From Swiss-Prot:
One of its GO terms (biological process) is succinate transmembrane transport. This is Na(+)/dicarboxylate cotransporter 3. The keyword Membrane applies. Keywords: Cell membrane, Glycoprotein, Ion transport, Membrane, Sodium, Sodium transport, Symport, Transmembrane, Transmembrane helix, Transport. Belongs to the SLC13A/DASS transporter (TC 2.A.47) family. NADC subfamily. It comes from Mus musculus.
Length: 600
């Protein structure tokens, strides 16, 4: 028995190597079960899917496999594979990451967060709302992981003032954890990017969370404090995941949708920064509202009894202390600097230009140029380029005439060294791997083959299809990276839409947004893992809270797709650009020639 246990431990320690060696052998029958080229492409895709789900290789390294396997297996020449890693979609995402680096470099996000918390008040339910609103807003522009890691130390400082040091002694992961490498100094420093966290998770060394602390069960006040603490911690990663869906640059799956749309449907131009924001921002607000109500009621921050009950002096004093802490931290930032003002103006310009380039409901500024020449990537790169030469100190004309003034070079708002350190370049490779995979599916004919296998689903009502897709993907992404999940599912959803003869976006958007709705497990997303690693949450806390969050997300997404999304993306018709793809890729039955479809 001891020998068997020892052998099991050795197998577990070598599990990644075993997956690397055995999975390619296990998938070999696929090469003989399908037509040659389609079979080879499916072999590569399934191999990458298993490697992504098991993290046998780092995610970004797995994303590079098409560069090796597609040419060797005769699927795509290298000249067609490599450009997929630097499409204009990748540069749009890169520009967003660089802008986020500048915001974090000058602590602009921290100033915004503290100011919002000062405005919402210090009652627990209001603070939870403030945390969720602030985190979601930051997550629209920063990475979800960075937003979470920045807000958790702020929440910790507030909770220390509310409940004292005894309950706050394990408020953050242990010093030295890579997932919180930049939570330094006064406990309120932010993690600049998700790069360190992803690196640690890809390496396979995820620290076990400490056991939650023991608190006396005989005290209702202690139970109230424990629940408030959990409510704070759990609301931050959830709102980060929700907020990331509101903009195209907010999370990688949104940009993967844009890139794969251009691959499968080159004539599709309905999705851009502006149209996506008009669709996703109201959905984000609705989800934040119902999520806040659910978390507040579940963890005691808000209840009918608390509204009627007079506040105790202890709680009133604690709230006053929390308010003082927030104000003190805000004052410690000092007066707003010239660099902060400059970054804020450039950030606003960045967002406004992206939104107004081609908002669809009115002509955008891109109409002043030749059609198709100016994309969102052009806008993003143009703005972030300014960061590398615009001075961080206020320029002065007197300097030119004062010959005694020091002749030191003015530092720019962002240095390239800082950008190199903080931008998660691995995500760029991951995006490229998804686009290369989509290109391989199209060129090899695998997309057409998948479409043929989906023939039995042609009679599924589209509304039911949306619900099923969102549920399946939301469940799948609880156990796998949301980026890997959407890379795998989007080609299938595109072909399913052709078979159902519905607008492709009617299925592809729910799949994309749904893969961000991962709330039930610590391993589902890096933000969940960071919150769980504080040691104050149990898995059952996340399952209990996240189950209803997932359900609410699915229902709200279905509501959005069948109401305002119909108008924004013209989902009630089967577009010509999809019809062209259908004619080239799959032979639709004669009965499916009507150009209008009812989606609900």
């Amino acid at each position: 028995m001891a020998a068997l246990a020892a052998l099991a431990k050795k197998v577990w320690s070598a599990r990644r190597l075993l997956v690397l060696l055995l999975v390619p052998l296990a998938l070999l029958p696929i090469l003989f079960a399908l037509p040659p080229k389609e079979g080879r492409c499916l072999y590569v895709i399934l191999l990458m899917a298993v490697y992504w789900c098991t993290e046998a290789l780092p995610l970004s390294v797995t994303a590079l496999l098409p560069i090796i396997l597609f040419p060797f297996m005769g699927i795509l020449p290298s000249s067609k594979v490599c450009p997929q890693y630097f499409l204009d979609t990748n540069f749009l995402f890169l520009s967003g990451l660089i802008m986020a680096s500048a915001i974090e470099e000058w602590n602009l996000h921290r100033r915004i967060a503290l100011k919002v918390l000062m405005l919402v008040g210090v009652q627990p339910a209001r603070l939870i709302l403030g945390m969720m609103v602030t985190t979601s807003f930051l997550s629209m522009w920063l990475s979800n992981t960075a937003s979470t890691a920045m807000m958790l130390p702020i929440a910790s400082a507030i909770l220390k003032s509310l409940f004292g040091q005894r309950e706050a002694r394990k408020d953050l992961p242990r010093e030295g954890d890579e997932s919180t490498a930049a939570v330094q100094g006064n406990g309120l420093r932010t993690v600049p990017t998700e790069m360190q966290f992803l690196a640690s998770s890809e390496g396979g060394h995820t620290e076990d969370a400490e056991a939650p602390m023991e608190l006396p069960d005989d005290s209702k006040e202690e139970e109230h404090r424990r629940n408030i603490w959990k409510g704070f911690l759990i609301s931050i990663p959830y709102s980060a995941s929700i907020g990331g869906t509101a903009t195209l640059t907010g999370t990688a799956p949104n940009l993967i949708l844009l890139g794969q749309l251009k691959s499968f449907f080159p004539q599709c131009d309905v999705v851009n920064f502006g149209s996506w924001f008009i669709f996703a921002f109201p959905l984000m607000l609705l989800f934040l509202l119902v999520g806040w109500l659910w978390i507040s009621f579940l963890y005691g921050g808000m209840s009918w009894r608390s509204w009627r009950k007079k506040k105790s002096k202890i709680r009133a004093d604690a709230e006053d202390q929390a308010k003082a802490v927030i104000q003190e931290e805000f004052q410690n930032l000092g007066p707003i600097k010239f660099a902060e003002q400059a970054v804020f103006i450039l950030f606003c310009t960045f967002a406004i230009l992206l939104f107004s380039r081609d908002p669809k409901f009115i002509p955008g500024w891109a109409s002043l140029f030749a059609p198709g020449f100016v994309s969102d990537a052009v806008t993003g790169v143009a703005i972030v380029t300014i960061l590398f030469f615009f001075p961080s100190q206020k320029p002065s004309l007197k300097w030119w005439f004062d010959f005694k003034a020091p002749n030191s070079e003015t530092e720019p708002l962002l240095s390239w060294k800082k950008a190199q350190e903080t931008v998660p370049w691995n995500i760029i490779l991951l995006l490229g791997g998804g686009f290369a995979m989509a290109k391989g599916c199209e060129e090899s004919g695998l997309s057409a083959w998948i479409g043929g296998q989906l023939h039995p689903l042609e009679h599924v009502p589209p509304l039911l299809a949306v619900l099923l897709i969102t549920v399946v993907i939301a469940f799948f992404t609880e156990f796998a990276s949301n980026t890997a999940t959407i890379i795998i599912f989007l080609p299938v959803l595109a072909e399913l839409a052709i078979r159902l003869h519905v607008h492709p976006l009617y299925l592809m958007i729910p799949g994309t947004v749904g893969c961000s709705y991962a709330f039930m497990l610590p391993v589902s997303t890096p933000p969940n893992s960071i919150a769980f690693s504080t040691g104050h949450l149990l898995v059952k806390d996340m399952v209990r809270t996240g189950l209803l969050m997932n359900l609410m997300g699915v229902l709200l997404l279905s509501l959005a797709m069948n109401t305002w999304a119909q108008t924004i993306f013209q989902l009630g018709t089967f577009p010509d650009w999809a019809n062209t793809h259908a004619a080239n890729a799959t032979a639709l039955p004669p009965a499916l020639t009507n150009n209008t479809v009812q989606t609900f």
